[in-house]
Amino acid sequence: MARDITFLTVFLESCGAVNNDEAGKLLSAWTSTVRIEGPEPTDSNSLYIPLLPPGMLKIKLNFKMNDRLVTEEQELFTKLREIVGSSIRFWEEQLFYQVQDVSTIENHVILSLKCTILTDAQISTFISKPRELHTHAKGYPEIYYLSELSTTVNFFSKEGNYVEISHVIPHFNEYFSSLIVSQLEFEYPMVFSMISRLRLKWQQSSLAPISYALTSNSVLLPIMLNMIAQDKSSTTAYQILCRRRGPPIQNFQIFSIPAVTYNK
């Protein structure tokens, strides 16, 4: 069963480069939806993980300019695709995915991400087999797979289809960084939280020895995995509040491109 969850639309604004030029003002409206695959939702614990190989997590974007669809044939689409492609380093180095492909399908730019931390075999070891063996155990999470993050952005400019790419990039970075920090890290930490995914990467080899040392069986594996996911100290918001010195743990300059002006 697949279900979609849509976040509230966010509006951003930036002025022209010269003396807050009103004519060069750029507005944008962003709406994102995540697709969840799994059983019917219940009141029990839910553990959200990325769609695992051979499946892949899709980051999908499409663009509008003054309410008109930006199509693959337009030069603006090409430059926006380059901006999306510039985020590969973020997904690979900070969230530990492999970007398998950056494709264009039906006027959408799609990043295909392969999870490098979890596999189906590990989910079987950590969740499925303990649930089969320990039917009496309580507090086990239900597994749901996040298969897609889809975003539609509508840019508004007083100058028609004229847009300066250097003004677009801050909108991309501000929106996606705020979406991750305020929503995705809290709701889907095993998918979008750098610290949660890093902790899982470091600790997954220790989970079975700890469970067997404490109980002589695998009964604690699902509970410990869920504890990593539910630890709110893994969120960027918590790290910002508690970290008084030093550089930010996560770099949210996700997108970049040379500042060039296009008019098409």
From Swiss-Prot:
GO terms for cellular component: nucleus. The keyword rRNA-binding does not apply. The keyword Nucleus applies. It is found in: Nucleus. Residues 200-221 are annotated as: Leucine-zipper. It holds the Pfam family REC102. Keywords: Meiosis, Nucleus. One of its GO terms (biological process) is meiotic cell cycle. Its main location: nucleus. Signal peptide: none annotated. It comes from the Eukaryota. InterPro entries: REC102. Required for formation of the SPO11-mediated double-strand breaks (DSBs) that initiate meiotic recombination. May mediate the interaction between SPO11 subunits during meiosis. Also needed for homolog chromosome pairing, synaptonemal complex formation, and for the proper timing of the first meiotic division. Not required for mitosis and mitotic DNA repair mechanisms. Interacts with REC104; seems to form a functional unit with REC104. REC102-REC104 interacts with SKI8-SPO11 and this interaction is required for proper subcellular location of the proteins during the initiation of recombination. Interacts with MEI4, REC114 and SPO11. Belongs to the TOP6B-like family. Despite weak sequence similarities, may correspond to the subunit B of a SPO11-containing topoisomerase 6 complex specifically required for meiotic recombination. Retains some of the structural features of the ancestral archaeal Top6B subunit (AC O05207). This is Meiotic recombination protein REC102. It comes from Saccharomyces cerevisiae (strain YJM789) (Baker's yeast).
